[in-house]
A protein has these predicted regions:
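Active-site-adjacent loop and "lid" segments of alpha/beta metabolic enzymes
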Residues: 50-133, 142-155
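Conserved anion-binding
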Residues: 1-46
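A signal for specific C-terminal beta-sheet/loop modules enriched in small/flexible residues
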Residues: 30, 37, 131-143
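A short, structure-level motif marking secondary-structure boundaries and short turns
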Residues: 10-11, 42-43, 85-86, 136, ...
């Protein structure tokens, strides 16, 4: 929501259009025959609401239970300080790029748009590790990983 970049503003766009469009995006999607939603929380750069987008992940899951995620890997590429820093410290870039995906996962995200396909070799093991952490954390509350979960494939 360009008019209200808060959690409430993001929810409002989906619910009723939040005064920026005539109806909510969920209603529009339903009218188009879409009934399986992937909720992208629209991450903005650091200093412009990136944290709000992550917090919106919890709100979306709590309110609707729909799968939620984002292209959070765009945050490091929009970070001016990191662009300068990586000129002398190239090793910092992939850590922040791949690490950003873990933030979305640990905030309850169901998917991450991890960036160009070249990132897959770094992103997949890191994201699998985060999935295993989450699986272990949820075990004592009765949540079991699905059969093809990294917990079973990689341990």
């Amino acid at each position: 929501n360009p008019m209200d970049p808060t959690v409430e503003g993001k929810i409002g766009i989906w619910e009723d259009g939040a005064g920026t469009i005539d109806k909510g995006l969920l209603e529009m999607a339903a009218e188009c025959g879409i009934d399986k939603y992937l909720m992208d929380v629209a991450v903005t750069p650091l200093g412009q609401g990136a944290g709000v987008a992550v917090r919106t992940s919890f709100a979306v899951k709590s309110k609707w239970g729909y799968p939620v995620g984002s292209g959070i890997h765009n945050v490091p590429s929009a970070w001016d300080w990191l662009r300068e820093y990586k000129k002398d410290h190239k090793e910092a870039w992939p850590v922040c790029d791949v690490g950003s995906n873990l933030i979305q996962q640990m905030a309850g995200g169901d998917f991450v748009l991890y960036g160009p396909i070249e990132n897959a070799k770094m992103a997949f093991p890191a994201c699998a590790m985060a999935d295993i952490f989450i699986s272990e954390a949820a075990k004592d509350i009765g949540t079991e990983p699905v059969e093809d979960h990294p917990f079973f494939k990689l341990l």
